[in-house]
Amino acid sequence: MDSYKTFDYDVLVIGAGGAGLRASIEASAAGIKVGLVCKSLLGKAHTVMAEGGIAAALSNVDDRDDWKTHFADTMRGGQYVNNYRMAELHAQEAPTRVHELESWGAVFDRTDDQKILQRNFGGHKYPRLAHVGDRTGLEMIRTLQDHGIHQGIDVHMECTII
């Protein structure tokens, strides 16, 4: 008979992409014992393929940008069938999340006056994408992994959930 090792967690997060890592970090910060399961090696999630950047109305390149304009662009881009509240929350929270990543060690491209550089992307009225060259997803995963591991999140790699 095979023997199995058992673990006891308050929260088990399945998937170690950007969303799974961020959920694990949030739960751990609340004092909850977290286990994170990924089917491959940590850092191999699809988030690393994201090249363009993170849409956030930081107003670093054009000071006319704000969360309401970002929200309107998001709704228009989704032909108004998006979940209204989720689009609104994203537009409101995105600048805080970008600064959070930066405080955790993410290294974004910079303007001449050392603000986070933003570039144009389809459907956005103003330059809004905070980026790290064409490796934004890789930098985001690296930052979230490092922060999560330093918080003591237990990571189980190469596991299958059935």
Feature annotation, model-predicted:
Residues K39-I162:
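Conserved N-terminal/central alpha/beta ligand/cofactor-binding core
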Residues M1-V11, A29-A30, V132:
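Extreme N-terminal leader/targeting segments of oxidoreductases
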Residues V11-L36:
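N-terminal Rossmann-like FAD-binding beta1-loop-alpha1 element of flavoenzymes
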Residues F7-Y9, A30-K33, E51, Q151-I153:
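Short coil/turn connectors at secondary-structure junctions
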